[in-house]
Amino acid sequence: MAPILFVLASLLFAFPLSAGWGEENLEKIREIRLDPDQCYRVRDIFLEREDLKFYFVDGHLIFGQPVAGRTVAALFVASEPTDGGEIILFPPSKRERQSLSRFTGQPVLNEKFRTAMLFFTDDTAEALRSALQKDEFNQLDPEAGRRLPGRWDPVMKNLLRSVELAVLSDAVSGRDPQSGFFGAVISGGTLGRFEVVIDPHRDEQVSVGQLVWSDSRDYYEAWCRFEGRNFAQGRRAKREDEARLEDYRIESHLDQELGMKVVAQATFLPITANTKVFAFELSRRLRLTKVLLDGEPVEVLNSGGHTLADTPLRRNNIVGIAVPDPPVPGSRHEIEFHYEGRVIGDAGGGVYYVGSRESWYPRRGNRFTSFDLRFHYPEQLDLVATGKLVETTSGEGTRSSQFHTETPIRLAGFNLGVYKRVTRKVGDYTVEVCANQGVERSLKPLAKPDVVAAAPIGAPRRRRDPFREFPSTPTVLVEGKRAPPPEPTLRLDAVADLSAQAFKFFVERFGPPATREIVVSPIPGESGQGFPGLVYAPTLSYLDPDEPPLRDLPARDRLFYTQLLPAHEIAHQWWGNVVTVSESSDGWLMEALATYSALLWLEDHSGPEARDELLLQYKNKLLELNEDGEPVESAGAIVLGDRLRSSEFPSARNVIVYDKGAWILHMLRGILGDDNFLALLRSIRDNYQFKSLSTEDFRSEAARFVPQDWPDPQLENFFDQWVYDTGIPTLSVQYHAEGTPPRVRFSGHLIQQNVPESFTLMAPVEIHTSPGRSLYKWIAAQGESTEFDVVLRNKPTRVVLDPKNVVLAVKRD
């Protein structure tokens, strides 16, 4: 133990901690090079990191130059054609093995490689040096030490940018190596370049993935991600966030060009001991210029990143601060961020796009807290935001508005434009709907050119050219008249009525929402978003479905924009803003609940036929085939969340999370019954108010409402099949009847195809008999054929499989 303590103590003081020490030492980290004096010719070096096993069979191992007295990088490279290494990984769950197989073709990662660039703040360096001593073959190679850095130093420098802030933080904070991270970039094998990461900050610490370029865009494909073995067995603990922010007070100044200058104050609560570097997330479009802690300036660190995994696709920057003395865990401090930039774009037509809606202020996680927001903006504009409007004043070309939250919320946002507004009262609640006076440039109709005759030039033709296939009279194209642009304000009252109806429907069934006032406001584009008390709805949701451009869309898209999407985003006032999730693997719950809530409202508004038509469309989208002939639903289990989006299945994340998510809830409703299902939703809202809900929490809560005689009382089989696995079966029923009334023996077989033999489900059949009677029976099906018997009083006249449409399946007569 003593050597480790000595190393940790040395880390605390090896970096100079004078004014500006953070950026100075970040530069030292950025300048780390491979150490020519620490290059070894190696054979059979074994390194185990959690579930990952590395075998450096033959090649060179060269360490990076030490920083703060500690080695944080190393490179293995195969120097000869017969050299190489091997990485082996056996994911612990069926779901992750399926995911790995989807990308690599095998459920186990067993890849030979030529190079491995390693970065770490754990005990990897010590483990490698210990392994070197076990075989006399492993010797220093000065010649290779002189040769390798020239080629590999630029690569290491580039990759270090992704982890430099973590290296600095761990080094100066003197953390136990058990809480350190590990990352490796592997290349030279059949799978191309890929990354492995062990990040103690995450619930799923082990991650393997690859950056892919396809169809003119990047995808980060996470092959597998899971809890590390030592974390699962209690030998290592998940690392806490170093601090959290509470009670935001944000003052924003918008100039005439809508550039922002912001001062964001918050209560700063340190959590971990001996921490001198703290990281926050902020939009890439904003530049942090100054930070004060308890009124004193602290150093700002604008860094490249904090982890290797998915860094290239991160939409936000990781910014840090370096403090001279570590604050005491549990103490309270005031922090003040000064930053500026541009997150608002001009979409044309007096319409503005507010980007970076979740990162326009510094964050560390999404905890429920209070917000006080003040905006100063051009007087000709209107601005809405989360929270209750406290006051608005105007003068000298500037308008100022203050908003304050009355209940804790997770996210604060704003929107602006030139609005016309209407208000609806829903009991004690207020629904305000804003519409832009015009539409964005992309929705304005293009002018159609007119063809007109031009005056002849020179002498007239004496005879027609026999080779011309058009009149010899010259023509020219001139700009014709533009059709009038759509007017969002014409349907403002209709949008307000619909919004109020949906809001009232949800209040009556789910209970109190996140805030007492809700504002629906327009945003360019095709998608929306639901913040606490603030709904972003696309301009398309305001337009007449019988006029261009909506008139030219399929009927299902017109319904989506004008009814479903607004209802979905309003439902997020409950699902996401009262009840939330903390892990990405549970994020599907919020989208599925919002999607199905919109379907419940549509069912109440337009009847069950409208709901079933949409469920059929959702099923068809899940069954659509990609270029390899695979259905979208097969991309992975719904709990993979954002990981479902890949180059093979670009649409899979949305289709599975939203559409299959709605089907999962619809099937659950079929099991519980209508009353119990609605009671479940209300129970979740009440029991998880301002708390995080996990998938397993949801299963346990739903199990409380399962009928007593249900064969899967804890819903474990249901969740194992529909939530944690994939598959949509094709079902059919074969049957025959023997005997005479009043004792007719009915024998049936439920046939299940296009799914694995292990696929299990509960499917209902309805057996009709004369005179006009029927028996509704659930069948527990597994495998290709499941036999069932029923004794009837009368002969069957027909059998209907899943008559209430409560099973996600293709049904054959």
What does each model-found stretch correspond to?
Residues S18, D294, F403, P449-H749:
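Hydrophobic alpha-helical and helix-loop surface patches within well-folded domains
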Residues Q233-K238, V319-A322, V328-P329, H338-H376, ...:
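Glycine/proline-rich low-complexity spacer/linker segments in large multi-domain proteins
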Residues A171, G180, V185-D241, E281, ...:
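Non-catalytic accessory/interaction domains
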Residues P3-P16:
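Bacterial N-terminal signal peptides
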Residues A19-K261, R363-G365, E716-Q721, P729:
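N-terminal, polar/Ser/Thr-rich
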Residues G228-A232, R236-Q265, L269-T275, E281-R285, ...:
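Hydrophobic helix-coil surface modules that form long, contiguous segments used
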Residues N317-I321, H333, E784-V790:
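Short strand-edge motifs at loop-to-beta-strand transitions and within beta-strands
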Residues T275-G305, F368-S370, H376-Q380, E766-L775, ...:
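Solvent-exposed beta-hairpin/edge-strand motifs
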